[in-house]
Swiss-Prot record:
It comes from Influenza C virus (strain C/JJ/1950). Its main location: host cell. GO terms for cellular component: host cell cytoplasm; host cell nucleus. Pfam families: Flu_PA. It is found in: Host cytoplasm; Host nucleus. The gene is PA. Binds 2 manganese ions per subunit. A motif (Nuclear localization signal 1 (NLS1)) lies at residues 109-124. InterPro entries: INFV_PA (IPR037534), PA/PA-X (IPR001009), PA/PA-X_sf (IPR038372). This is Polymerase acidic protein. Mn(2+) 2 binds at residues 65, 93. Mn(2+) 1 binds at residues 41, 93, 104-105. A motif (Nuclear localization signal 2 (NLS2)) lies at residues 166-228. GO terms for biological process: cap snatching; DNA-templated transcription; symbiont-mediated suppression of host gene expression; symbiont-mediated suppression of host mRNA transcription via inhibition of RNA polymerase II activity; viral RNA genome replication; viral translational frameshifting. Keywords: Cap snatching, Endonuclease, Eukaryotic host gene expression shutoff by virus, Eukaryotic host transcription shutoff by virus, Host cytoplasm, Host gene expression shutoff by virus, Host nucleus, Host-virus interaction, Hydrolase, Inhibition of host RNA polymerase II by virus, Manganese, Metal-binding, Nuclease, Phosphoprotein.
């Protein structure tokens, strides 16, 4: 740290102000000139607060500025709670107990009110704003402050300005108004600590790893000897891919793979209502839908369109309506709920035999043979559902996200703008709808599993969203909507281990007839009619359509609960991928090219009629999100094995692209390993087909390592 700034600060600032400023600069890695700026601001805040009492004799002002960020946030939240105020999304400097308002203090050397206007644009009238200038001007959005406060503060600022001018430091601390602000980056303590923690083993610190990498020199002879040694140990000949080309992956044949996600996606139909903040619990939402929407009138017909156990599902549906009507959300144990919930149907262990009893025969100890899953072919329905997930839904704001913290500098403003741009594209997609459904529904199931493990409970399959802007101006737009997709019954759930399973029975609404190949696992009933709103010209008309009830018994594990309830993480991976591309392009050009990159850079998203389809990065975001979410919902051992092996082919493809030689020990064995993972997972089969298409396209463009059958 430069001693010049610290020494000057110590000559005219209070010791406490200097200490606070030094700690802030060291913690956040700011420029040394900030010592004087922060110190002056803190001392002005102290002058604003000191020696002023409320009518009851206690201190009128509470000083928030100068505390550690965590402590300051806690204090501000406590004050909001104590005085029944709305929590603020940003930190203020002071709290006025007498007027029950927060106060923001600003200090500027500008001759106009631009600094005040920028603060007012961010904060509005949510708090008092006082901006003091070195030339004696005060900009504010309310009455005050007291005359004595103003005199003390202006006197101090004038003294500070004179002192800094004598030391020729006034212009050093503040950049001239006609120059652009320079963003100077410095590594703070937290950054350095996280950087050292992230280095791979065997390195202990970043500097150690950096030193090793800088001194490392590749030795071709040494590398060749290591390869030869590895070859002699494995006793397999090295095969260069130019002579031993990769063939296409053979997809399994047979019936199409069925739909295996826990909830319907493209076929799902939802009932909507305006959200009531006072009735936001899952059970209350379900009661309101059945009461106001008359959903109790839904009655499945006796004969299903397809599926097994229709009597059990019909009786359980009647029990669900009774549980909602009496507001208990609990279903009593009976033959139907126990059968569908799998209660008492677990395989029994072989009984222990005491020494005094006869020994049981070897035949009695034999375990039934495990049946391997039947191989399934690529499902035609998957492509249609993939494209549906990419498109926009009627509503937006499906995934609940935390509010952005207040930006403290231009770099954070820039990052916030980029994230809001990407989030605006993603939040209105059908994929975001399904993510929101998983987050809230599985979150409610997790709560019921923890609180009522021994009970059979009713939980809504629901999500929350916001309406898009009305097509006709002047119509009121509800801020938030509750969307009900169906009802889920949780069976008994004693989850002692992470892989512990529990049964759920889902009843989901749809206005589409079932696809026998896709919905093999469902029992489907006709259940009456519903009204669909359709836009015809400038008016909206209602049309009655049949309503179907899709019923299914499936299971969830403790681990799957965690994955689905945290599906919003798919946003992070997606946005991080695109952000990296944008920042890399900007770094190359040494200018802000974010908007240009989002709108002009193309990404391959698929193939149609034998030709590649590419879209701008802004729209390709959707494909990235769908891919991440599908990894989340279809994840199993097949998908993990496939992804682990396919990357070796992709590495060879990248090497071919860079005109480098690639080799391995057993290319045919690698393909066989991949094909072992292709059984009945729809996502695996989809990715294998995409990989084949990628290989075909690469071969057309001159790739040397692949051959087309």
């Amino acid at each position: 740290m430069s001693k010049t700034f610290a020494e000057i600060a110590e000559t005219f600032l209070e010791p406490e102000a200097v200490r606070i400023a030094k700690e802030a600069v060291e913690e956040y890695g700011d420029h040394e000139r900030k010592i004087i700026q922060i110190g002056i601001h803190f001392q002005v805040c102290c002058m604003f607060c000191d020696e002023y009492l409320s009518t009851n004799g206690s201190d009128r002002f509470v000083l928030i500025e100068g505390r550690k960020r965590g402590t300051a946030v806690s204090l501000q939240n406590e004050l909001c709670k104590s005085y029944d105020l709305e929590p603020l999304p940003f930190l203020c400097d002071i709290f006025d107990r007498e007027e029950k308002q927060f106060v923001e203090i600003g200090i500027t050397r500008k001759a106009d009110d631009s600094y005040f206007q920028s603060k007012f644009g961010k904060l509005g009238n949510s708090c008092k704003i006082f901006v003091f200038s070195y030339d004696g001007r005060l900009d504010k959005n309310c009455e005050g402050p007291m005359e004595e406060q103003k005199l003390r503060i202006f006197s101090f600022l004038a003294t500070a300005a004179d002192f800094l001018r004598k030391e020729n430091m006034f212009n050093e601390i503040f950049l001239p108004d006609n120059e652009e602000t320079i963003i100077e980056m410095k590594k703070g303590k937290t950054f350095l600590k996280l950087r050292d923690e992230s280095v791979p083993l065997p390195f202990q610190t970043y500097e150690q790893m950096k030193d090793y990498c800088e001194k490392f020199k590749g030795n071709p002879r040494e590398l060749a000897s290591k390869v030869s040694q590895m070859q002699s140990n494995i006793k397999l000949p090295i095969k260069h891919y130019e002579q031993n080309k990769f063939r296409q992956i053979r997809l399994p044949k047979g019936p199409m793979a069925p739909y295996t996600h826990k909830f319907l996606m493209e076929e799902a139909w939802m009932f909507t209502k305006i959200s009531d903040p006072e009735r936001s619990r899952a059970g209350e939402i379900l009661i309101d839908f059945f009461k106001k929407g008359n959903l109790s009138a839904i009655r499945p017909k006796d004969k299903p369109l397809q599926g097994k156990y229709p009597i059990h599902y019909k009786n359980l549906w009647n029990q669900i309506k009774a549980a909602i009507a009496d507001r208990t959300m609990v279903i009593s144990e009976n033959d139907h709920s126990e059968f569908l919930g799998g209660i008492g149907r677990a395989s029994k262990k072989i009984p222990e035999v005491s020494l005094t009893q006869d020994v049981i025969t070897t035949e009695g100890l034999k375990q039934s043979e495990n049946k391997l899953p039947e191989p399934r072919s690529f499902p035609k329905w998957f492509n249609a559902e993939w494209m549906w997930a990419i498109k926009d839904s009627d509503l937006t704001g499906w995934v609940p996200m935390a509010e952005y913290p207040p930006a403290d500098n231009e770099l954070e403003d820039y990052a916030e703008h980029l994230n809001k741009t990407m989030e605006g594209v993603l939040q209105g997609t059908n994929c975001a709808r399904e993510m929101g459904k998983c987050i809230l529904t599985v979150g409610a199931l997790m709560t019921e599993c923890r609180l009522f493990p021994g009970k059979i409970k009713v939980v809504p399959i629901y999500a929350r969203s916001k309406e898009r802007k009305s097509m006709q101006e002047g119509l009121p737009v509800p801020s938030e909507m509750d969307c009900l997709f169906g009802i889920c019954v949780k069976s008994k759930s004693h989850l002692n281990k992470d892989d512990g399973m529990y049964t759920i029975i889902t009843f989901e609404f749809s206005i589409r007839e079932p696809n026998l190949e896709k919905h093999q696992k469902y029992t489907v009933f006709e259940a009456g009619h519903t009204t669909v709103r359709m836009k015809k010209g400038e008016s909206v008309i209602g049309r009655e359509v049949p309503l179907y009830l899709y019923c299914r018994t499936t299971a969830l594990s403790k681990i799957k609960n965690d994955w689905l309830s945290k599906a919003r993480r798919c946003f992070i991976t997606t946005m991080d991928t695109v952000e990296t591309i944008c920042l890399r392009e900007s770094a190359k050009a040494e200018e802000n090219l974010v908007e240009k990159t989002l709108n002009e850079k193309q990404m391959w998203i698929g193939k149609k009629n034998g030709e590649l389809i590419a879209q701008p990065l802004r729209e390709a975001l959707r494909v990235q999100l769908v891919q991440q979410f599908y990894f989340c919902i279809y994840n199993d051992s097949q998908l993990e094995g496939f992804c682990n092996e396919q990357k070796k082919i992709l590495m060879a493809l990248e090497g071919d692209k860079k005109n480098k030689s690639s080799f391995g020990f057993n290319p045919e064995g690698l393909l066989e390993k991949i094909e072992e993972c292709l059984i009945n997972n729809p996502m695996c089969l989809f990715m294998a087909q995409r990989l084949n298409e990628l290989v075909i396209e690469a071969s057309k463009r001159g790739a040397k390592f692949f051959k087309i059958d």
